[in-house]
Amino acid sequence: MTFEAMFAKVKELLSGADVSGIGEHLAYQFNITGEAQGIFYVEVKDGLLHVEPYSYNDCDAAFTCSAETLFKIASGQSDPVGAVFLGKLKVEGNIDKALKLKSLLPSES
């Protein structure tokens, strides 16, 4: 899978996220490893969600993982905290803000 295909899928998965209740600015950078290697960011600002295929200088938290791990997290099949403990997701930066990523993700069915 190419980075472009992976990014389009992630953007679609996050498109339904309700960020209206998030009253603070959140900025996350995702560093994707493996076949779909690349960088993109997710930002919540002024009640709007932005997902763009660029790096984000001065982000609150940076996540590094494979596309497979990212899809499992973004679709609600895997818990991001659990992925960190399993070594599948690396997190750098503000951990308190990183934990708020869960509020953007679908709940597990």
Segments from the language model and where they lie:
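Feature captures hydrophobic
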Residues: M1-S109
